[in-house]
Amino acid sequence: MAFTYSDLITQIRNYAELDSNGLSDSTISVIVQNTENRIYREINIDAYKVYASAVTVAGTSTISVPSGLRNIRYVQLVDSTGNVANLLEKDSAYLAEYIENPSSTSLRAEPKYWANFNATTWFVVPVPNTAYTINIAYYSQPTSITTGTSSTSTTYISTYAQDLLLYGSLV
């Protein structure tokens, strides 16, 4: 049986032996969101595996990161003949040292490395000499049970691991 958010609120208050005056809905919401975030940091759940693709532009070292990305599984490059190679993750400082002059056309080649630039952009180096497909496998950030209607809102965790969600919220 799946826990709805309403069920979870009731169970937390019952275990804590407090009513809504002692443990408000907003406080429970924060507790539950923190619990969910800890679960998702420590456990990669197959239900949240996602795949995305991006295409590089010759002479441009940046690509857009998929929204909702939480944890990278792998990043692959596919060339025009269908050959697949894994890109290695490096720190952005390494990429800056690897290619000191990104505008130099003589240094353009098939990318080997990627690094985070910010929440929406990655760098790849060497700077691509042509268009390549970048396949990204990752775990997405699930929607919190607290964001829905309390009487009907459920999540994968509240359906298949309701004890984990409840006891995590009580700790």
Where are these regions (language model features)?
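Glycine-enriched, solvent-exposed interface loops adjoining structured elements
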Residues: M1-V171
